[in-house]
Amino acid sequence: MPEHYDSMETRDPAVREREQFARLSEIVARAMTAPGWAKHLSGVNPKAVTSRAALASLPVLRKSDISALQKEHPPFGGLNVTAGNKVRRLLMSPGPIFEPEGAGADWWGTARALYAAGVRPGDIVHNSFAYHLTPGGFILESGAHALGCADRSSLATE
């Protein structure tokens, strides 16, 4: 078994930072296609967000602001860039904050963290997070399945 999840984990730090900041302007530009983000980031030139200083200058969106935006513009406050037909689940975190779960195999990126913690394909992951409106159970399950693991909640009763 490889020691690392993929080659991204063994990149030279300077290369990693260069690649991350090269993508950051694309991420900011995509966020600004949502009306809530466009308003929050008004005056920001996405193409200029290419350094730590530029990142630090972006306005912070606080959890309380998200909750207020979602009350004003349900369900996502104008912050969602995922098309409605691409949303697998509508989840709710404490706040309350409503969150869309997209349709990707490991939407939350949890497989990488599980791998770093020593979880490997074929392992059984005991997932004791809730599966109600909160995302915890779904987040762990998607990462376990992306790694090729069974999570305890998906196993048939013996």
Regions found by a protein language model. Give the residues of each.
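Conserved AMP-binding loop of ANL adenylate-forming enzymes
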Residues: 116-147, 151
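Nucleotide 5′-phosphate-binding alpha/beta core
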Residues: 1-116, 120-122
